[in-house]
């Protein structure tokens, strides 16, 4: 049975923790609004970019098609780009993305494929390193980045394209969490290379309009596809930030409520024990008085 002093110390400790989780919840809520606006603003641009590529790709085939669109013609080496958060305390947000990437990697390895992994975010790297340390090809550290910008995604995109041009992989897949709401973030896998031009939503958006291109479609694709890779990565990073803040807000809200429940239980235990101690002392005083 803990002493009254121990209970007082524990209540004070839980109250201090509750203040921290409440503050973190408020900070996450403030950041969530900006992150959600940024993610929602990036979606139409990235979707329209995909629609434009889908439309142009219909006019290009054979030897004219850029390598980034048609790939190497092989399916032997897969590059997985796994985007997670740099920090924790956001529930299962990071583990869900890592689990999707891990399951995909296991499936590819079971099929005899070669897998290479680039991690963006410390938490994903920590999780995947436990099982796939030999497969980790590179890590992108964004811990010092205060505000995500397109240049950060562009650097990752250039790194991926350089590896492709060096023949380091055949297929590249991007893993991130698509933000749906504060309580819903969906782990998502998106193929970057070869560029997927047969996506139904993109084809529908592209429509049946007939365009003339200057310069020729192949030249336009050679410029747009690298740009699209960076755009899709940037969107994924923005979706991740919004999802992380939503998950963190929910996690800290639950932690704050759990701390409140624990404080109530400890307070009840403290009051009962204190009451029992007072009763015991009164009995001792009365017994002593009767003895006199």
Swiss-Prot record:
GO terms for cellular component: plasma membrane; proton-transporting ATP synthase complex. Keywords: ATP synthesis, Cell inner membrane, Cell membrane, CF(1), Hydrogen ion transport, Ion transport, Membrane, Transport. One of its GO terms (biological process) is proton motive force-driven plasma membrane ATP synthesis. It comes from the Bacteria. GO terms for molecular function: ATP binding; proton-transporting ATP synthase activity, rotational mechanism. Its main location: membrane. It is found in: Cell inner membrane. It is a peripheral membrane protein. The keyword Transport applies. F-type ATPases have 2 components, CF(1) - the catalytic core - and CF(0) - the membrane proton channel. CF(1) has five subunits: alpha(3), beta(3), gamma(1), delta(1), epsilon(1). CF(0) has three main subunits: a, b and c. Produces ATP from ADP in the presence of a proton gradient across the membrane. The gamma chain is believed to be important in regulating ATPase activity and the flow of protons through the CF(0) complex. This is ATP synthase gamma chain. It comes from Brucella ovis (strain ATCC 25840 / 63/290 / NCTC 10512).
């Amino acid at each position: 049975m803990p002493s009254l002093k121990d209970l007082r110390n524990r209540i004070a400790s839980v109250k201090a923790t509750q203040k921290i989780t409440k503050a973190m919840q408020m900070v996450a809520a403030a950041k969530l609004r900006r992150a959600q606006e940024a993610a929602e603003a990036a979606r139409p641009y990235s979707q329209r970019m995909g629609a434009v590529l889908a439309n142009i790709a219909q006019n290009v085939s054979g030897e004219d098609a850029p390598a980034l669109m048609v790939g190497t013609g092989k399916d032997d080496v897969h590059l997985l780009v796994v985007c997670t958060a740099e920090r924790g305390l956001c529930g299962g947000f990071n583990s869900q993305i890592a689990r999707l990437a891990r399951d995909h990697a296991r499936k590819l390895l079971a099929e005899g494929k070669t897998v290479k992994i680039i991690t963006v975010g410390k938490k994903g790297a920590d999780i995947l390193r436990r099982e796939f340390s030999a497969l980790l090809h590179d890590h992108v550290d964004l811990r010092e980045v205060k505000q995500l910008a397109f240049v950060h995604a562009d650097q990752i995109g250039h790194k991926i394209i350089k590896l492709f041009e060096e023949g380091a992989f055949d297929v590249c897949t991007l893993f991130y969490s698509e933000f749906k709401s504060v309580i819903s973030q969906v782990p998502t896998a998106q193929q970057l290379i070869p560029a997927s031009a047969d996506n139904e939503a993109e084809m529908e958006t592209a429509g049946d309009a007939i365009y003339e291109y200057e310069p020729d479609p192949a030249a336009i694709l050679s410029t747009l596809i690298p740009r699209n890779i960076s755009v899709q990565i940037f969107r994924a990073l923005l979706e991740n930030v919004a999802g992380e803040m939503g998950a963190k807000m929910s996690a800290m809200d639950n932690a704050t409520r759990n701390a409140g429940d624990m404080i109530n239980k400890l307070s009840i235990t403290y009051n009962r024990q204190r009451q029992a101690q007072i009763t015991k002392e009164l009995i001792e005083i009365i017994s002593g008085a009767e003895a006199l």
